[in-house]
């Protein structure tokens, strides 16, 4: 297995929640020599400095300051959350069996969650003498399972059965004697009295590289941890640029991005403003020279159902990076931003392909459109082609993740200068 693919798998296998994903990326940046900043502190930025900050335990922004006078911001945005089940505040349901009360987070495919080992991960807030403290928590063993109903009892199971999340998707914890044991286990793992929690279910199956040529990768949360990791690696490997490279990994994309740590928040806008203030730069002039790559996975043409794809814009796994288009601006790509990205990919030797929704199958929106309300710069929406988006176990091509790392390294090593009719790419 290629070392870059192994590193991606290691990340996927550790990122059992949005909080664990952020912590892993923060540690990766710290190990690469980046200094952590805190929003409540004064910032002392210096030429050649490498910095990162987090918000809400689940979003991250990193940036580098060039030695010379900066010409603008080169930004990428991805997200670290995934559709899953969130554990309710009072979660124990005790009767003949002990079950867990959960609710859906995001728009998921429900059926793949059933009949497979699950556990819980996220963060808990525990009581301390001075106040409260937030800790990561991951019960790293097979703990729960959502059982299916036998075909003998549900004859419609294979005929378009409609799931009721209040009934069908409650995880089994144990028998009647298990009542009270899971809350006690969580407090034991947390090391104190839990006053609040943000806990989510995750599947126990590890990331897998497979296929006759080992060309595919399957894992939980490829949408969008695959882009988050590849953009981070490209950011770290990018060469010197006269622009300021900025890496953004947001939370809450799967539920509309409206949170203090989502793309719809002030996080990116606040960070860019503080960079400009700290370096005595004109914010308007900097944004006029800036560019954003919004990286969120795309639908590959399905091998069994090609009819769901637009005939002329149907990306395949392993076919290169996907540029996403939409006439109603669900994606922010236009002719200029697409051309800039194509040019950078061409220089890096990376293939690109295109995606449009089929005209009668409208799709969703993503990070770029939402962040533009706060930071209005030319934006290209891209992604990696994948199958089974929003399943708990998704599939993509190994080569595409490597291509995104290569392309973002080339992007972050470039300098973009706005011209009267386009961009100069140095």
Task: Say what each PLM segment does.
Residues 1-426:
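N-terminal hydrophobic/helix-forming segments and targeting peptides
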């Amino acid at each position: 297995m290629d070392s870059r693919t192994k590193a991606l798998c290691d990340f996927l296998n550790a990122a059992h929640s949005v909080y664990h994903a952020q912590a892993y990326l923060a540690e990766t940046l710290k190990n690469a020599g980046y200094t952590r900043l805190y929003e409540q502190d004064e910032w002392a930025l210096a030429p050649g400095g490498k910095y990162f900050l987090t918000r809400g335990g689940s979003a991250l922004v990193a940036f580098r300051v060039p030695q010379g006078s900066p010409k603008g911001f080169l930004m990428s945005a991805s997200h670290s959350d995934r559709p899953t089940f969130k554990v309710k505040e009072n979660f124990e349901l005790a009767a003949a069996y002990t079950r867990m009360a959960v609710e859906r987070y995001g728009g998921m495919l429900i059926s793949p969650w059933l009949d497979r080992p699950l556990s819980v991960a996220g963060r808990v807030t525990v009581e301390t003498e001075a106040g409260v403290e937030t800790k990561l928590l991951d019960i790293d063993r097979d703990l729960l399972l959502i059982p299916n109903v036998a075909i003998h009892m549900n004859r419609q199971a294979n005929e378009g059965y409609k799931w009721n999340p209040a009934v069908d998707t409650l995880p089994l914890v144990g028998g009647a004697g298990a009542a009270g044991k899971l809350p006690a286990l969580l407090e034991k793992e947390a090391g104190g009295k839990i006053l609040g929690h943000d806990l989510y279910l995750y599947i126990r199956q590890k990331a897998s590289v497979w296929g006759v040529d080992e060309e595919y990768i399957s894992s939980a949360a490829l949408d969008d941890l695959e882009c988050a990791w590849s953009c981070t690696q490209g950011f770290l490997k990018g060469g010197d640029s006269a622009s300021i490279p900025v890496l953004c990994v947001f939370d809450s994309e799967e539920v509309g991005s409206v949170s203090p740590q989502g793309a719809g928040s002030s996080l990116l806008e606040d960070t860019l403003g503080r960079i400009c203030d700290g370096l005595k730069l004109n914010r308007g002039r900097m944004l006029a020279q800036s560019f954003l790559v919004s990286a969120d996975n795309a639908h590959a043409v399905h091998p069994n159902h090609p009819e769901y794809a637009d005939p002329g814009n149907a990306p395949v796994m392993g076919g290169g990076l996907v540029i996403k288009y939409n006439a109603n601006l669900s994606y922010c790509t236009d002719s200029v931003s697409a051309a800039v990205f194509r040019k950078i990919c061409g220089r890096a030797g990376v293939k690109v392909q295109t995606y449009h929704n089929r005209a009668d199958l409208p799709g969703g929106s993503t990070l770029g459109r939402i962040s533009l309300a706060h930071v209005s710069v030319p934006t290209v929406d891209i992604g990696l082609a994948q199958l089974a988006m929003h399943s708990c176990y998704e599939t993509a091509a190994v080569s595409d993740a490597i291509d995104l790392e290569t392309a973002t390294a080339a992007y972050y090593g470039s300098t973009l200068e706005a011209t009267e009719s386009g961009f100069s790419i140095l």
